[in-house]
């Protein structure tokens, strides 16, 4: 039951990272997890079976307009006009990412989650899109159920991280004495009440919390994160809630790459409040072109209302995409994977740092990939082994950067 069509694609294992094991000429591959005796016990390989209801969509060499229709039907319409989209791609989709595309979306509205646009007339594609939407809805329930089941742990993490951030912010607060209608009486001002009918004869100490920075959260939403979806959504919730509690502007989005498009799903913008539940819509699919996602994040951070910017990136340090690197003799006919992709991601992290943006990696993965994470993020890396470590580890790195 494997659908076939001509094209060049990667067949991959789902583990802590993607590992290429060959090329096949298929359009659609449904992936059924099974355990491989030759792999570590905590990793899963893939069989090419039609029975499982989630999809690994490999890139297809076809009309980019059709690809856009497909990706939009899966993830939601673009936030930008066609003209704005073209301008951004001319700016961002260059070098290693030439011939790639971007989709910035806020997702699909609830009333359209189980519908498919009429312009998708291919019956096979319609079935695949509908199956993906059903999986997305199921994953929302799983994410929320996981958070509620571990509510005590996550609420405790929010409390600890909020307290840690507030302690740091207090050292940067501006304190001044202001005239007020209540507070401690100031004898020198009493005459104003008697002769000028001015009741502001008291003195009150105002502490103005002025966090001069914003935080963006970028989440890897590729298929290699399927086993971590609930934890990623919950950790992003904890981080977002803690920052918001301290009056720090937060923007949150995920990324994955399908059919030549890197999809940036915007869950929360800087001026959105009380929308953390949107994070439970986090779902993993496709590949991850980390370098292009970082460029897209840089674009989104231009809207920050603060002079200093921080970017948290939830990553497994294993960038991979079936769209080849676009330019340069060294990269010609080379897939975006392994050393090439890691180096590209490292370069993009460094580019952001050179522009004054602090990039912090949040990593949960294998020891091998931990070395790659260190290579990409340097000292600004949070390695998480359990849920209970998250708040303290993130708080520690934040305080180091902001001190």
Feature locations, PLM:
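Acidic, glycine-rich A-domain
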Residues: 133-403
